[in-house]
């Protein structure tokens, strides 16, 4: 059982390929290094995707995210690299990665990167009552 950082992303077959549904993940402890100063940068990543044939396996995602801990990377570059690797592994219908980096020099940086599978169109939204977002583990 691997407990070391790894760039290997694993997938499993989407159990419901006939329906568009959103998978939402929050990764509150992303860390990489500032390529200019070598100081750690911390971010909260939010991953939303609509799978096609494959879903990402959570432990491999955790080890993949962990692999950036000692790498120097600009916020924009690392967000897009992670998105590209997820797209290559899963080939989702749609995916959005939002990186919210904690304050550095008085500046917060948010980077949002998206990919949409060629030809895929979302279903029209069904407008119901608006509910506040509810999270499993926090407010």
From Swiss-Prot:
Reaction it catalyzes: 7-aminomethyl-7-carbaguanine + 2 NADP(+) = 7-cyano-7-deazaguanine + 2 NADPH + 3 H(+)
EC nos: 1.7.1.13
The UniProt record lists the keyword RNA-binding: no
UniProt pathway: tRNA modification; tRNA-queuosine biosynthesis
GO biological process annotation, one example: queuosine biosynthetic process
GO cellular component: cytoplasm
SUPFAM superfamilies: Tetrahydrobiopterin biosynthesis enzymes-like
Protein location: Cytoplasm
InterPro entries per the UniProt record, alphabetical: GTP-CH-I_C/QueF, NADPH_dep_7-cyano-7-deazaG_red, QueF, QueF_type1
Primary location group: cytoplasm
Function: Catalyzes the NADPH-dependent reduction of 7-cyano-7-deazaguanine (preQ0) to 7-aminomethyl-7-deazaguanine (preQ1).
Family stated for the protein in its record: Belongs to the GTP cyclohydrolase I family. QueF type 1 subfamily.
The protein, known as: NADPH-dependent 7-cyano-7-deazaguanine reductase
Native source species: Nitrosomonas europaea (strain ATCC 19718 / CIP 103999 / KCTC 2705 / NBRC 14298)
Lineage: Bacteria, Pseudomonadati, Pseudomonadota, Betaproteobacteria, Nitrosomonadales
